[in-house]
Structure formats: C-alpha cells, structure tokens
Regions:
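A short beta-turn/loop motif at secondary-structure boundaries
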Residues: 161-167
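N-terminal accessory segment detector
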Residues: 1-129, 154, 164, 178-179
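A general secondary-structure signal for short beta-strands and their flanking turns/coil
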Residues: 94, 150, 168-170
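Active-site helix/loop of acyl-thioester processing domains in fatty-acid/polyketide metabolism
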Residues: 127, 131-150
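Generic structural signal for short, flexible, solvent-exposed coil/loop and linker residues
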Residues: 86, 142-144, 162
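Hydrophobic beta-strand-centered segment that forms part of the acyl-chain substrate-binding groove
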Residues: 150-159
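C-terminal regulatory/effector modules of DNA-binding transcriptional regulators
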Residues: 133, 159, 170-173
C-alpha cells in the first residue's frame, strides 16, 4: 500500500492480521478500504492480487504470446477466446479492453451469474459484497492478459459484479493499455 501513497494513519485503521482464509475478514478489510481510500487506490491495490497465476492457464497464455507475437493487439484480442477460460475480451473504441465473465452458475447466487471465487463460495445466501472485492479476480485476468497480449495493463474499472447484484450482472472489468 506504500506504492499507492497511503499514509500510516489510514493503514493503522485496517486489520492486516486477521485470518485471510475467513471470507468475512476479507470483506471487512475491503469495506474499510472503500471507506478510507479513493477508488483509484482500491483498484491499484486489488489489481496486484489475483489467484491462479500459475498452472495450465499461465502456460497457455505464454504459448499464445509466442504464437501471435507478430500480430497487432486488435487481432490478438480477437483470438484470445481460443485460450481456455480466457473469455472473449473486447477492444473498445477508446483503446481499453473489457472482459466479461458471465452466464456461469454454480449455485452461489440465485441470478444467472455467479462468482467463481473459492472464498465467496463459503458464504451463505443472501449477501452483498462491494465490487472492490472483484479487483482480485480482475488481477488474475490482468496478469494473464498481459502475458498473452504482450502489453502492460492497468485495472480501470470494475463495471459490474454478481456479488452486489445477487447474480443478476456478470463479472465485467475494463483494463487500460499502458504501452
């Protein structure tokens, strides 16, 4: 959080010692972040998180990068859906990239979309969680898209989330291309 220039007085108000395997503790920390930090600071912190940065998906994205290194970004984005579990990203007119992860239902929510986060699956219905939490998942996609596309990305926005819509809206993130 020092990179985000968050002062010590604010940091002291956050509980970093709580058991991170308990989703309620994580949710409390996220709520405190939302209360004390700017949206930009929250996104900057959360995009550094993300699970599943290794394994087969990592190998597949790095192989995709080698295979398509000579192609322009727009073509790479159009081909990304060929990589398993990497969705179908969309290159917006302003040069940002939007990723939608939806129509997945595993029973976490009653709507047509659900959260695939292992911690969230431990919670009992009904619940509503700040979309800031989803920055962690966005960090997962940011990592893999950077590797696959060969560009530096920054999380610009968490557009929607099933976590605060009871599954009515999908996970949707927008990334800014930095180079």
């Amino acid at each position: 959080m020092k990179k985000q220039k968050i002062n010590g007085e604010i940091m002291e108000q956050m509980d970093f010692e709580a058991d991170c395997n308990n989703p309620h503790n994580i949710i409390s920390l996220i709520d405190k972040m939302d209360e004390l930090l700017t949206q930009g600071q929250c996104l900057s912190i959360m995009e550094k998180q993300g699970c599943c940065k290794g394994g087969q998906r990592d190998k597949d994205c790095k192989a995709f990068a080698l295979e398509h290194a000579d192609k322009p970004l727009s073509e790479k984005i159009a081909l990304m859906s060929s990589v398993q579990y990497m969705m179908s990203p969309y290159l917006n007119d302003d040069g940002t990239i939007t990723v939608t992860f939806g129509d997945d239902q595993n029973g976490v929510h009653t709507g047509k979309n659900t959260c695939s986060c292992g911690s969230i699956k431990k919670l009992k219905q009904p619940f509503s969680i700040s979309p800031t939490y989803c920055g962690c998942c966005a960090g997962h996609f940011l990592y893999h898209y950077q590797n696959a596309l060969g560009v530096k990305l920054k999380l610009k926005e968490i557009n929607s989330s099933p976590l605060n819509t009871n599954g009515e809206k999908p996970c949707k993130f927008t990334f800014e291309v930095l180079d």
